[in-house]
């Protein structure tokens, strides 16, 4: 298959894909890969296969095609293509919750010589890196990466990238419990979709609605949460977007749990868990198990809650997500306290405080924890976060966290 025919077939696949005939599109692209001798065409079709498998939640397949794409980029001896293929490799690992690998591949991207693609893709590299740091609960570096990605988006008038970064920032602030910002950023993403997104994939609308649903639930606005989640789920079902379907099911389950309707919550947690296990979203499985554990606690079935916590803890440690570990130790602590088991209680108290230290989830000005309850937060230019009230009361010209770490004794 020559260059022109390859190009034709790739376009045919794209048209099928955009009209939701995904399996037919995959067949066309796979045939191109088998028959085409045109390296440029092969590189492009591998990019299409990476994106399609990502949206379907077939992350192991996505990773496989990303690896082949790197080999093709090396054959082409082009730094632009190499950057693009390393970014796809980083994203594949991000989806599989291999966050340390993601960060490593993103650093490889940033270390490549300055290229035309570097200007276009630098923001996406920073976004993927931020998502990976967030997956590891390294909050300062996550925020630093997101802000860098946002600067790329603004400097290049890239509204699509800005939309994705706003969704990630929504997730960031939901985790550190500044619910006002957790809602502000996905609302900003939805506004970008309305203003610029006529020709965009509907997944951007679905993504912003999902993150709005999460924030509304945390704020106790359960009707609005349900409305946004239903809209997101509708698009996810239309497009066969399995990863988003799983997230919506998890959000529905959390909404029903918040309403005290445990009968309805349990099967939704099970469905979310089933899809997340199938696609390999281990962090999503941790969140589903945490929700299940909270349901069992509400029913006073403490041993069943501890079973769910144990499974979640294993996964959270495997993935390296410190915030989930912290939440699980906190829940275990309250269970063992009510059971009157002092030895187990003490062990979880110790681990809980270790996790707080590791995540640096405390305000460097007042010393109180961050992320325990909803409070307004503010980041300094170094991306360390503090209670807004503390910054207003104390006023700070330099970051106390940075000051402290620079004073730590080093090895000479």
From Swiss-Prot:
Q: How is it modified after translation?
A: Ubiquitinated by the BCR(KLHL8) complex, leading to its degradation.
Modified residue annotations for Phosphoserine: 405
Compartment list = Cell membrane; Postsynaptic cell membrane; Cytoplasm, Cytoskeleton
The observed outcome of changing residue 164 to C is: In CMS11; reduced coclustering with acetylcholine receptor
Which residues belong to zinc fingers classed as RING-type? 363-403
Q: What is the effect of changing residue 162 to K?
A: In CMS11; reduced coclustering with acetylcholine receptor
Q: Which InterPro entries match?
A: Postsynaptic, Postsynaptic_CS, RAPsyn, Rapsyn_myristoylation/link_N, TPR-like_helical_dom_sf, TPR_rpt, Znf_RING, Znf_RING/FYVE/PHD
Example GO biological process: positive regulation of motor neuron apoptotic process
User: What Pfam families does its record include?
Assistant: Rapsyn_N, TPR_8, zf-RING_2
Q: Which domain of life is it from?
A: Eukaryota
**Which windows of the sequence hold TPR repeats?**
6-39, 83-116, 123-156, 163-196, 206-239, 246-279, 286-319
Keyword annotations of the record: Cell membrane, Congenital myasthenic syndrome, Cytoplasm, Cytoskeleton, Disease variant, Lipoprotein, Membrane, Metal-binding, Myristate, Phosphoprotein, Postsynaptic cell membrane, Repeat, Synapse, TPR repeat, Ubl conjugation, Zinc, Zinc-finger
Question: What is the annotated signal peptide range for this record?
Answer: none
Annotated membrane topology: Peripheral membrane protein
Query: Which positions carry Phosphotyrosine?
Result: 196
Task: Kindly list the GO molecular function terms attached to this UniProt entry.
Answer: acetylcholine receptor binding; ionotropic glutamate receptor binding; protein-membrane adaptor activity; structural constituent of postsynaptic specialization; zinc ion binding
What functional role does this protein have? Postsynaptic protein required for clustering of nicotinic acetylcholine receptors (nAChRs) at the neuromuscular junction. It may link the receptor to the underlying postsynaptic cytoskeleton, possibly by direct association with actin or spectrin.
Domain comment in the entry: A cysteine-rich region homologous to part of the regulatory domain of protein kinase C may be important in interactions of this protein with the lipid bilayer.
Family statement drawn from the similarity comment of this UniProt entry: Belongs to the RAPsyn family.
Provide the protein name: 43 kDa receptor-associated protein of the synapse
Q: Which organism is it from?
A: Homo sapiens (Human)
Its organism's taxonomic lineage begins at: Eukaryota, Metazoa, Chordata, Craniata, Vertebrata
């Amino acid at each position: 298959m020559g260059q022109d025919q390859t190009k034709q077939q790739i376009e045919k696949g794209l048209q099928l894909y955009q009209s939701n005939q995904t399996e037919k599109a995959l067949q066309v692209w796979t045939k191109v890969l088998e028959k085409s001798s045109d390296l440029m065409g092969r590189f492009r079709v591998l990019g299409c296969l990476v994106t399609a498998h990502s949206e379907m939640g077939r992350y192991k397949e996505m990773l496989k095609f990303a690896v082949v794409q790197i080999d093709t980029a090396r054959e082409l001896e082009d730094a632009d293509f190499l950057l693009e293929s390393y970014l796809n490799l980083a994203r594949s690992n991000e989806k599989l919750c291999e966050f340390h690998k993601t960060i490593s591949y993103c650093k490889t991207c940033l270390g490549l010589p300055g290229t035309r693609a570097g200007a276009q893709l630098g923001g996406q590299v920073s976004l993927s890196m931020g998502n990976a740091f967030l997956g590891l609960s390294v909050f300062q570096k996550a925020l630093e990466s997101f802000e860098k990605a946002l600067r790329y988006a603004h400097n290049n008038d890239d509204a699509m990238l800005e939309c994705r970064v706003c969704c990630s920032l929504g997730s960031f602030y939901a985790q550190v419990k500044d619910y006002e910002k957790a809602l502000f950023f996905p609302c900003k993403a939805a506004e970008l979709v309305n203003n610029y997104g006529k020709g965009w994939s509907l997944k951007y609308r679905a993504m912003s609605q999902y993150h709005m649903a999460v924030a509304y639930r945390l704020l106790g606005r359960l009707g609005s949460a349900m409305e946004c989640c239903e809209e997101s789920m509708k698009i996810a079902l239309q497009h066969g977007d399995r990863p988003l379907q799983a997230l919506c099911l998890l959000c529905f389950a959390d909404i029903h749990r918040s309403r005290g309707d445990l009968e309805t919550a349990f099967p939704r947690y099970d469905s979310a868990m089933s899809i997340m296990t199938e696609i390999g979203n281990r962090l999503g499985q941790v969140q589903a198990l945490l929700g299940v554990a909270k349901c069992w606690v509400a029913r006073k079935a403490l041993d069943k809650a501890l079973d769910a916590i144990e499974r979640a803890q294993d996964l959270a440690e495997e993935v390296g997500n410190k915030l989930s570990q912290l939440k699980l130790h906190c829940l275990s602590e309250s269970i063992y306290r009510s059971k009157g088991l002092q030895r187990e209680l003490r062990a979880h108290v110790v681990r809980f405080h270790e996790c707080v230290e590791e995540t640096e989830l405390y305000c460097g000005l007042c010393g109180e924890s961050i992320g325990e309850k909803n409070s307004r937060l503010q980041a300094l230019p170094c991306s360390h976060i503090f209670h807004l009230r503390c910054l207003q009361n104390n006023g700070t010209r330099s970051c106390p966290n940075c000051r402290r770490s620079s004073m730590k004794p080093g090895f000479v």
